[in-house]
Structure formats: structure tokens, C-alpha cells
């Protein structure tokens, strides 16, 4: 139940700070979550508190309550929060022993906090709001509620959430809020959120008839309609053509494999919690070693194709490419339209290269990714060098191998003069990555293309090639995916374009609008000529008045409309209208065909 207001045009130029860049904003939001919890427990004494962190746009807190919160409850909670803020309560940090913390929590009857305490190491810290309320928390916070602006926050919605993200545990009530440093920032945030709701790919995807989710199929498993399938196929065909120019070879691999394959790759040991459960083969008595799992990644399959024969140094680089569907067991609460699904298609490719080819092939992959972004008119992006966290044990391979791979990626980024930043802990478990972070029309960030250098999987699978001197040498692998995930890309494109796809990408590129039934035969003749050159065209045979025909085409966001009446049929012309530029006047079929062919081939946004 989002609570939104119409913003004023004067806020257009406001730059919203990001939590990651503003320590004060982080403190404001973290303290605001505590203020909200204090208000909730005053108004609803039976509510038990769990966790309440800051987020990139605000904060939330999870509560265990006898009854769900209502819209009226949110208003009352917000009003109470304003009272707490205006009291200018000091926010005091206190260190206590584990025993002291346990005694205090037990005295309050807070079982969730007691469970949290069990997983903490000393010193245990508490944060107090005045002398009336405290929370088990590591901070940071503001020093007093006087630093919180009562006109710069709002409570937005209530949602269900499972304790610890575990569907088998208690379902809680999560209240989401947003908080900023100034009222102007709050107004601008709400304006952007309202625009985001208009662009929401779930809403537009339904209205434009592109995809759907069905309960009998299951959550996170999208179904693609004919129009949505055209959109997917157009993107796939585009990338396949670009890959063919660069010497890629297409392969096809199955959707599942024996678990042993993923034990060798390390996925079973390091990625198992994100994989679907194992399926037993025929008779469970044959043992779990014979079990099958849905693939979470395509790389082990491409490795098997490489290993099928002994390779010569002359054959390398070998570039294997596949639009392969993979499966990740995302929690239901983490699913979100097309951007977070359980089954998705990756534009995957794995390059097997000699060490002396690594730099040039890496640069070539980056060039491909940049050309894809250009064709899609995705202009605002930055590069993240995703390196391992040396303090974590979730990675495979030696320090030397990791340092070599990370150095190769950083050298490539510097050679290209890229604006990059390093993301420690963002690497895949088997190797570092160069990730492209796209910033959309609403300044939200999404990870799209990625390219990875991998010395580990060639070692684990004992990959070899025959060198020029006859010795057996180890190739280096490059993993790359310009789109990242086809589903996520389409979700992002729907929102970036607000459903107004560029002409070359639109599922329906032109709609013919007959003014009377007497011109239907002529419309079908024109449609046949356009289809013959690959143009996606439909004839509106509904019989509605012209005004409604145009409105329906506008609502469906068709790039080009051709109005055809008796005069056009007699002169064998069409009256052309586009969404982007309005009326183009009268064109012959030959002229329209020529202009459409040229615009689509050049991937122009409109006619």
C-alpha cells in the first residue's frame, strides 16, 4: 500500500544522495527504523521486534503481531514517530556482557532478539532512545532524534516476510519506510517512485501482453506470449549475428546433469543453497551419486564440449556460445517480476584461450558488450571490478591464481580507459569479474553484462591443449554474458523505454488502420508485402471508428500507424503516423518499405 504524493516540477533537478555515499543518511535511516519500532510497541504492546536495517532508499522493520497492520495503523504509527522525533531524545550506545543482554531481553519477553543474541560475538551493543526504549544493535546511529527531520520521512507499505528468510519459520509483518535529509529530497523521491510505478515492467508487460506468471506453473517461472517471444527472439538474433561476426560457435546443452559434474566444478560445494534439490535416478537405492540437478550455470557443459577432443594451440581461441536456461532456487520473497526469477536464459559464452591471447580476447569481449549497449541505447553505465574478499573462504583456487586473474582484468580496464571501481567480495566463487552497472532513467542501478577471467575451472577439469612445442598446456577460460540474463534485460528495457520500444525491437512495428471494410483487401496486400521483407505488421480488423483505432494503437505503443481509406487504396498509398514524430504524410508502399527496411537494419529508434 504505497503512500505517494504528486511532486512539484521544481524538484526535477534535485540529486538524491545514495546511502552508500552518505554516512549521515545511513545513520538517519537506521535510527528512523528504531523510532518506528518504538512507536509500534507503544501503540501495539503485543508486537515483538526482530530486525530493522537501513536500505538504499529508506528502512524497514519486521514485527511479529497478532493482527496485520492496516493503512490506518501506518498513519497512527507515523504520527507517533513524529512525536518521538520532536522530543529530541538522545541516542545512546551501551556495551553489555552477553549475560546482561540475555537477562534484559528475557525480561522484555523478546524471543527473536534472544535468537539474534546467540549469533553475536562480544562486545554486545545496545542503542537507547532516551530512557524508554532500546534495541540490540551494532549501529551506527545519529546522536539525537533532533537530527531527524519529521517532514523528510514517510511510511510506504506493509509486506509479509519470513523470519530469517526461511519459509518454514514464522511469517512477520514488515513495514517499509523512506527517510531523507530534507523534505525536498523526499518529494523528489516520491516523484521518481510514482514514475517508476508507471514504468513498472510487471504492469506494462501485462498491459502490452508480453509475459505472465501462472500459479499452476509456479512463482519465478515466466511464460512468454507470442509478442514477448518476438521480443526475446529479436534480441537473441541480434546478439547471435554479432557473435557470428566475431567467430563464436553456437552450442546447445541440456537443462540438467549428474550432480558429479557440479562437484568437480565446485558449484555443489559452494553454490548448493542456490540450486534446486537433487533428483534421484530411477531407484533411490542406486545412491545419491547418481542424482541429477537442474543446472545453475552453463560453464561445466561447455567445458565438456571442449574436452571432447584434444585441442591444438592453432585452434585457440575456441568461443562457444549458447542461450542457455539455468535455474536458481530463489526464495519466494526475493522474486520480483522478470528481474529476479527461478528459471532464466543467459546469453552465455565461454572462451578457451592461450595465455598470450587473454588480453586481446578480453578486450574483444568488452568491445562486444559496449556495441550491444550502444544498439540498445543504454548510455549510462559504469564498470565494477568484482574481486574476491581475501578474508572469506567461499572462493576456490590459490592466491597466485586469483592475483593473476584480477591483475588481468584491471589491466584491461585501464587499457580501455574505463571509469571503474573495485567491488571487494563481488567475485564469483571461481574467478573475478568485470561487471557493467547500468543506470536507468530513474537513476536506479542494475547489473547487466559481465566478463570473467577463470584459471580455476580449467585446473579442476584438467583442460589441456597441445602447445607449439608439443607439450600439454592449460588454457584460460573467459566467461561472458553481454545481456547477463535475457529476462532481467527485458524487464529493464521495458522500464527504460516505458514500453515504447525502438522500431527495430518492437514486437509489432506497424499497424494498418482501415477506415472502412472496403479497403481490407488492400490492407492485407500491403501487410503481405511488408511481411515479405521481415516487417512485423498487423491489420486492425475490429471495425471501430478511426479515432478508436488510433487510440488502441497508441495504447499498445505501436511505433508506426498507417491510416488507409478509399483515397489511399485508390492511389495505392498510405497515410503514415508515428508515435515519435506524428504525421509523416502520404507514402507509397515502395517508399514505406524502403524507409522501414533502412530504419530497422540501422537499428534506428523510430521511422
From Swiss-Prot:
Positions contributing to Zn(2+) binding: 299, 350, 479
SUBUNIT field: Homodimer.
Native organism: Synechococcus sp. (strain ATCC 27144 / PCC 6301 / SAUG 1402/1) (Anacystis nidulans)
PANTHER family: THREONINE--TRNA LIGASE, CHLOROPLASTIC_MITOCHONDRIAL 2 (PTHR11451:SF44), THREONINE-TRNA LIGASE (PTHR11451)
Pfam families per the UniProt record, alphabetical: HGTP_anticodon (PF03129), tRNA-synt_2b (PF00587), tRNA_SAD (PF07973)
BP GO annotations: threonyl-tRNA aminoacylation
UniProtKB keywords: Aminoacyl-tRNA synthetase, ATP-binding, Cytoplasm, Ligase, Metal-binding, Nucleotide-binding, Protein biosynthesis, RNA-binding, tRNA-binding, Zinc
Lineage top rank: taxon: Bacteria
Catalyzed reactions: tRNA(Thr) + L-threonine + ATP = L-threonyl-tRNA(Thr) + AMP + diphosphate + H(+)
Region (Catalytic): 200-502
Protein name (Swiss-Prot/TrEMBL): Threonine--tRNA ligase
InterPro entries, per the entry: aa-tRNA-synt_IIb, aa-tRNA-synth_II, aa-tRNA-synth_II/BPL/LPL, Anticodon-bd, Anticodon-bd_dom_sf, Thr-tRNA-ligase_IIa, Thr/Ala-tRNA-synth_IIc_edit, ThrRS_anticodon
Any one Gene Ontology molecular-function term assigned to this protein's record: threonine-tRNA ligase activity
Function in brief: Catalyzes the attachment of threonine to tRNA(Thr) in a two-step reaction: L-threonine is first activated by ATP to form Thr-AMP and then transferred to the acceptor end of tRNA(Thr). Also edits incorrectly charged L-seryl-tRNA(Thr).
GO cellular component, one term: cytoplasm
Similarity-based family: Belongs to the class-II aminoacyl-tRNA synthetase family.
Documented EC number(s): 6.1.1.3
Cofactor remark from the record: Binds 1 zinc ion per subunit.
Enzyme class: ligase
Compartments reported by the entry: Cytoplasm
Amino acid at each position: 500500500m504505497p503512500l505517494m504524493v504528486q511532486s512539484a516540477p521544481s524538484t526535477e533537478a534535485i540529486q538524491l544522495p545514495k546511502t552508500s555515499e552518505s554516512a549521515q543518511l545511513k545513520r538517519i535511516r537506521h535510527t528512523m527504523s528504531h523510532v518506528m519500532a518504538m512507536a509500534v510497541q507503544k501503540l501495539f504492546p503485543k508486537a515483538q521486534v526482530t530486525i530493522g536495517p537501513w536500505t538504499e532508499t529508506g528502512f524497514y522493520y519486521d514485527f511479529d503481531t497478532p493482527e496485520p497492520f492496516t493503512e490506518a495503523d501506518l498513519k497512527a504509527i507515523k504520527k507517533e514517530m513524529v512525536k518521538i522525533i520532536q522530543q529530541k531524545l538522545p541516542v545512546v550506545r551501551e556495551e553489555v556482557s552477553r549475560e546482561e543482554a540475555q537477562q534484559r531481553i528475557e525480561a522484555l519477553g523478546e524471543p527473536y532478539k534472544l535468537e539474534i543474541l546467540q549469533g553475536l560475538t562480544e562486545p554486545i551493543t545496545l542503542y537507547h532512545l532516551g530512557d524508554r526504549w532500546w534495541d540490540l544493535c551494532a549501529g551506527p546511529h545519529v546522536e539525537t532524534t533532533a537530527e531527524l527531520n519529521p517532514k523528510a520521512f514517510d511510511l510506504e507499505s506493509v509486506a509479509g516476510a519470513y523470519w530469517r528468510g526461511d519459509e518454514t519459520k514464522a511469517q512477520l509483518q514488515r513495514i517499509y519506510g523512506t527517510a531523507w535529509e530534507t523534505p525536498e529530497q523526499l518529494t523528489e523521491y516520491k516523484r521518481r517512485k510514482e514514475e517508476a510505478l508507471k514504468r513498472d515492467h510487471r504492469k506494462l508487460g501485462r498491459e502490452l501482453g508480453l509475459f505472465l506468471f501462472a500459479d499452476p506453473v509456479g512463482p519465478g517461472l515466466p511464460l512468454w506470449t507470442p509478442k514477448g517471444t518476438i521480443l526475446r527472439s529479436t534480441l537473441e538474433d541480434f546478439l547471435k549475428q554479432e557473435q557470428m561476426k566475431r567467430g563464436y560457435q553456437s552450442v546447445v546443452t541440456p537443462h540438467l546433469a549428474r550432480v558429479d559434474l557440479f562437484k568437480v566444478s565446485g558449484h555443489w560445494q559452494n553454490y548448493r543453497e542456490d540450486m534446486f534439490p537433487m533428483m534421484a535416478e530411477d531407484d533411490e537405492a542406486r545412491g545419491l551419486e547418481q542424482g541429477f540437478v537442474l543446472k545453475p550455470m552453463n560453464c561445466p557443459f561447455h567445458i565438456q564440449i571442449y574436452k571432447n577432443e584434444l585441442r591444438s594451440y592453432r585452434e585457440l581461441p575456441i568461443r562457444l556460445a549458447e542461450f542457455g536456461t539455468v535455474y536458481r532456487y530463489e526464495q519466494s520473497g526475493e522474486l520480483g517480476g522478470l528481474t529476479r526469477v527461478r528459471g532464466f536464459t543467459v546469453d552465455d559464452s565461454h572462451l578457451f584461450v592461450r595465455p598470450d591471447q587473454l588480453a586481446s580476447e578480453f578486450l574483444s569481449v568488452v568491445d562486444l558488450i559496449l556495441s550491444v549497449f550502444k544498439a540498445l541505447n543504454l548510455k549510462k553505465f559504469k564498470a565494477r571490478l568484482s574481486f574476491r574478499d581475501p578474508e572469506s573462504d567461499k572462493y576456490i583456487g590459490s592466491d597466485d591464481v586469483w592475483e593473476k586473474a584480477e591483475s588481468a582484468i584491471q589491466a584491461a580496464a585501464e587499457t580501455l580507459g574505463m571509469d571503474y571501481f573495485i567491488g571487494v567480495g563481488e567475485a564469483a566463487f571461481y574467478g573475478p569479474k568485470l561487471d557493467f552497472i547500468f543506470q536507468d532513467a530513474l537513476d536506479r542501478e542494475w547489473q547487466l553484462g559481465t566478463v570473467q577471467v577463470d584459471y580455476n575451472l580449467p585446473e579442476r577439469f584438467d583442460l589441456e591443449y597441445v602447445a607449439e612445442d608439443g607439450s600439454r598446456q592449460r588454457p584460460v577460460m573467459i566467461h561472458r554474458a553481454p545481456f547477463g540474463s535475457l529476462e532481467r534485460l527485458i524487464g529493464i528495457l521495458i522500464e527504460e523505454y516505458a514500453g515504447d520500444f525502438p522500431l527495430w525491437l518492437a514486437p509489432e512495428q506497424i499497424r494498418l488502420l482501415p477506415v472502412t471494410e472496403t479497403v481490407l483487401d488492400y490492407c492485407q496486400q500491403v501487410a503481405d508485402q511488408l511481411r515479405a521483407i521481415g516487417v512485423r505488421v498487423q491489420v486492425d480488423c475490429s471495425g471501430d471508428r478511426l479515432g478508436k483505432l488510433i487510440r488502441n494503437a497508441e495504447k499498445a505503443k505501436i511505433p508506426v500507424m498507417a491510416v488507409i481509406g478509399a483515397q489511399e487504396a485508390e492511389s495505392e498509398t498510405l497515410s503514415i503516423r508515428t508515435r515519435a514524430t506524428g504525421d509523416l504524410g502520404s507514402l507509397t508502399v515502395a517508399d514505406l518499405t524502403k524507409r522501414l527496411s533502412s530504419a530497422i537494419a540501422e537499428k534506428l529508434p523510430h521511422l
